[in-house]
């Protein structure tokens, strides 16, 4: 299904779950919305932390239109689910942020690793959360991000189990896509990056890990949500983890090789 058709169904409330596997071949995006007076600090944070926060588009202040990524989209309605954070506390989860929108809001679209999953599949590497019909597993880590202005915190990662013999290939395939997190930041022992139990993700759902597989971890665009909990601004709006915007950007247009 074309991205604009998926967005229309989301806008109508007919799609309200995770978007992994939808509109294969098109990039998906995370969302961060905050007030204009914090926008420069956040843009600087993204520039200093490009693995977890690769910027695909930034809206004009007050505009809900991502003019580069999807010119006919509306970031207030075209994600299946949103999270509202007030002073660092998650207060609401909604399907439409139009009632919350303010004239000085700036929206950031952050590249999402769902965008390189089709490339993994094309290379014979199954994506477990798609096969199991669940959300991707995401975890807080002990990896510090580079601070910028008010923004500081630890990186969040997504995890996909990969057969050990294909782990290097998974790294090669995804390294072609730096605009959507690129290659993995860690392979193997989760404890080395501060993850205690793969069966208890901080965001998303747990997936099965089979004999002969290793966990492979990629930087994740949910990182700004963890950072928002530290910064505690008056209001930050994000997507709900796994519930992305389908953009009009072709995955392959983001590849470097």
From Swiss-Prot:
Its domain of life reads: Bacteria
Question: Which GO MF term does the entry hold, naming one?
Answer: lyase activity
Write down the EC number.
4.2.1.-
Q: Which InterPro entries match?
A: D-Glu_cyclase, Putative_hydro-lyase, UPF0317
Q: Which key words are in the record?
A: Lyase
Transmembrane segments annotated in the record for this chain? none
Enzyme class at the top of the EC tree: lyase
| A Pfam short name | D-Glu_cyclase
Q: Which family does it belong to?
A: Belongs to the D-glutamate cyclase family.
| PANTHER family in the record | D-GLUTAMATE CYCLASE, MITOCHONDRIAL (PTHR32022:SF10)
Q: What's the protein here called?
A: Putative hydro-lyase YcsI
Originating species: Bacillus subtilis (strain 168)
